[in-house]
Swiss-Prot record:
S-S bonds: none
Protein name (Swiss-Prot/TrEMBL): Endocuticle structural glycoprotein SgAbd-8
Keywords, sorted A to Z: Cuticle, Glycoprotein, Pyrrolidone carboxylic acid
Organism: Schistocerca gregaria (Desert locust)
InterPro entries the UniProt entry points to: CHIT_BIND_RR_consensus (IPR031311), Cuticle_Struct_Prot (IPR050468), Insect_cuticle (IPR000618)
Residue ranges, annotated region (Disordered): 111-139
GO terms assigned for molecular function: structural constituent of chitin-based larval cuticle
Glycosylation site residues: 14-15, 97
Pro residues: bias regions: 129-139
Statement: the UniProt record of this protein carries the keyword Glycoprotein: yes
Entry-annotated residues carrying Pyrrolidone carboxylic acid: 1
Domain Chitin-binding type R&R as annotated: residue spans: 29-99
GO cellular component annotations of the record: chitin-based extracellular matrix
């Protein structure tokens, strides 16, 4: 049976938010820079350019920028980032970080890293060649 769903209601300021500052520049070489700031405290900027132009397999766009705003709970949010051939790399005080490595594990990792490479233990393919399966009844 069909029942109309309640429509969400939005409260708050419905008046337009002014753009205080806006810039957008594109260069003939493909590099760019843009930025803006709004009347309610949102700000963002980014610049980018082609890295290693003309070098096959190394050519990639690289962008760096930031954005900031105030979260609904009133806390300031600010993110700086780089986006390149290795992915998106954000930094911000509010972003989660991995827990520290426990000292015992760190000592073990340091010990392993300090050991010389052992012959045949470097991933160089020192494995026995696979053998064919015997035919059924040929035992």
């Amino acid at each position: 049976q069909f029942r109309p769903q309640p429509q969400p209601s939005y409260s708050g300021n419905t008046s337009p938010i002014p753009i205080i500052r806006y810039s957008n520049e594109i260069s003939p070489d493909g590099s760019y820079a843009w930025s803006y700031e709004t009347g309610n405290g949102i700000a963002a900027d980014e610049s980018g350019a082609l890295e290693n132009p003309g070098q096959k397999d190394l050519e990639a766009m690289r962008a760096q920028g930031s954005f900031s705003y105030t979260a609904p709970d009133g806390s300031p949010i600010s993110v700086r980032y780089v986006a390149d051939r290795d992915g998106f790399h954000p930094e911000g005080a509010h972003l989660p970080t991995p827990p520290p490595i426990p000292p015992a594990i760190q000592r073990a990792l340091d010990f392993i890293a300090s050991q010389p490479q052992q012959p045949g233990n470097n991933g160089g393919g020192q494995f026995p060649r696979p053998q064919p399966f015997p035919r059924p009844g040929a035992f």
